[in-house]
């Protein structure tokens, strides 16, 4: 999958440009992860101390302002992602990566469990050169643990489109705890 934004840095198609949004507070940084259906991935990050905010949505595609139905239709190129606003002093990026690797199977190309489609691919989308370095080192270390080849893509974070409000904090709205440090098993649906 090409990540070429062209000579204009994505100006001709803003969806190919970088995610230029700011983190939700002073001292916070952003990270994006694709690891299958975003509902349970989001709840996992919500529970993590040092994470100030999570959002589910779509990134890495080429369709302007996609909806959930657009993305599920397979024509937009987007992945379902969780965008994490985190305090790197309280929760280093490496901890976010540990959660990412533990949450899904990074050796399946376009599926996680029963869910199939390019929107369910495995991806780490970085905002800084340091995030890229740590992500690539993390992938190399994880590859030593897997017999199958890891297919996780590591690319610059592109423009983020929030999913419809219905999807935000979906499992928490369905009664599952998002309390920091909670270790209750995550049920797939609320």
Curated annotation (Swiss-Prot):
Gene3D superfamilies: Peptide methionine sulphoxide reductase MsrA (3.30.1060.10). It comes from the Eukaryota. Residues 10-20 have a biased composition (Low complexity). InterPro entries: Met_Sox_Rdtase_MsrA_dom, Met_Sox_Rdtase_MsrA_sf, MsrA_MetSO_reductase. One of its GO terms (biological process) is cellular response to oxidative stress. It is found in: Cytoplasm, Cytosol. Disulfide bonds: none annotated. The keyword DNA damage does not apply. Its main location: cytoplasm. One of its GO terms (cellular component) is cytoplasm. It is an enzyme of class 1 (oxidoreductase). The keyword Cytoplasm applies. One of its GO terms (molecular function) is L-methionine-(S)-S-oxide reductase activity. Its EC number is 1.8.4.11. SUPFAM superfamilies: Peptide methionine sulfoxide reductase (SSF55068). It catalyses: L-methionyl-[protein] + [thioredoxin]-disulfide + H2O = L-methionyl-(S)-S-oxide-[protein] + [thioredoxin]-dithiol; [thioredoxin]-disulfide + L-methionine + H2O = L-methionine (S)-S-oxide + [thioredoxin]-dithiol. Residues 1-20 are annotated as: Disordered. Keywords: Cytoplasm, Oxidoreductase. Belongs to the MsrA Met sulfoxide reductase family. NCBIfam families: msrA. Catalyzes the reduction of methionine sulfoxide (MetSO) to methionine in proteins. Plays a protective role against oxidative stress by restoring activity to proteins that have been inactivated by methionine oxidation. MSRA family specifically reduces the MetSO S-enantiomer. This is Peptide methionine sulfoxide reductase A2-2. It comes from Oryza sativa subsp. japonica. The gene is MSRA2-2.
């Amino acid at each position: 999958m090409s990540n070429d934004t062209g000579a204009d840095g994505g100006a001709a198609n803003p969806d190919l440009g970088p995610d230029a949004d700011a983190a939700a507070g002073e001292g916070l940084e952003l990270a994006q992860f694709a690891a299958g259906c975003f509902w349970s991935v989001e709840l996992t990050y919500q529970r993590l101390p040092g994470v100030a905010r999570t959002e589910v949505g779509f990134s890495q595609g080429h369709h302007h302002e996609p909806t959930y139905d657009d993305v599920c239709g397979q024509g937009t190129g987007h992945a379902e992602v969780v965008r994490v606003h985190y305090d790197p002093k309280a929760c280093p990026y490496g901890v976010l990566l540990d959660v990412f690797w533990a949450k899904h199977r990074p050796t399946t190309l376009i599926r996680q469990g029963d869910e199939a489609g390019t929107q369910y691919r495995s991806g780490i989308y970085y905002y800084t050169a340091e995030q890229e370095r740590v992500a690539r080192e993390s992938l190399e270390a994880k590859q030593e643990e897997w017999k199958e080849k890891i297919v996780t893509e590591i690319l610059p974070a592109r423009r983020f489109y929030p999913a419809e409000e219905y999807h935000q904090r979906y499992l928490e709205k369905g009664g599952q705890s998002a309390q920091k440090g909670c270790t209750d098993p995550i049920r797939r649906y609320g």
